[in-house]
A protein has these predicted regions:
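Bacterial signal peptide processing site
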Residues: 13-15
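Primary mode marks residue(s) on the alpha4-beta5-alpha5 output face of response regulator receiver
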Residues: 22-53, 62-180
Length: 180
């Protein structure tokens, strides 16, 4: 049986308002660990705020008989522009898909702890695949995840009795798309 569990103090309907990042930091304010290399010659092309969930599944731990842990299945979020218009969505891959049909798939390049230990880390992802012809995401080479709120795996509730259970943890973040 596949069960779903929504964790956190906010239900899905209120996630965007309650978890909206405060004034997102500028790209140059990102920790040095998640700034693209200077020889990449990239700059910020566009930014978006994400609001949704980080989804985890309760899975057996390989090599540890009887142990279970929350494993990231992926994000499920809507991307919004500065004026609140929906720009696209963000889902497992990790993939960002724009409303114009362009999409990118990222790979972890670097990470830094969020200022609040209760929040998921800030990331630098390199683009490993472009999908769709042209579009807003076509020139993107890196993505920064900044100003995260929430999204961490539950601290407990994952054991043999809860195998395959899904925890949908509310989160928000500010994504900066970098290219040339």
């Amino acid at each position: 049986m596949h069960l779903s569990l929504l964790t956190g103090a906010v239900g899905c309907a209120g996630t965007r308002a309650a978890l909206q990042p405060s004034t997102p930091p500028a790209t140059d304010a990102a920790p040095a660990a998640i700034v693209p290399p200077k020889d990449a010659h990239v700059h910020a092309l566009v930014a978006a705020d994400a609001s949704g969930t980080q989804d985890y599944v309760c899975s057996p731990v390989t090599g540890h008989d009887g142990s279970f842990a929350w494993t990231l299945r992926g994000p499920d979020a809507v991307l919004f522009g500065a004026q609140g218009a929906q720009l696209g969505r963000h889902f497992a891959g990790p993939t960002w898909e724009w409303s114009d049909g362009s999409a990118i798939v990222g790979a972890l390049a670097a990470k830094a702890d969020a200022p609040d230990p209760a929040d998921i880390p800030w990331l630098l992802l390199s683009v490993k695949e472009h999908k769709g012809a042209g579009g807003a995401l076509a020139p993107v080479r890196f993505v920064q995840r900044l100003a995260t709120k929430g999204g961490k795996a539950p601290a407990d509730g994952c054991d043999g009795d809860h195998a395959n259970q899904v925890a949908r943890v509310p989160y928000s973040a500010h994504y900066v798309f970098l290219g040339s």
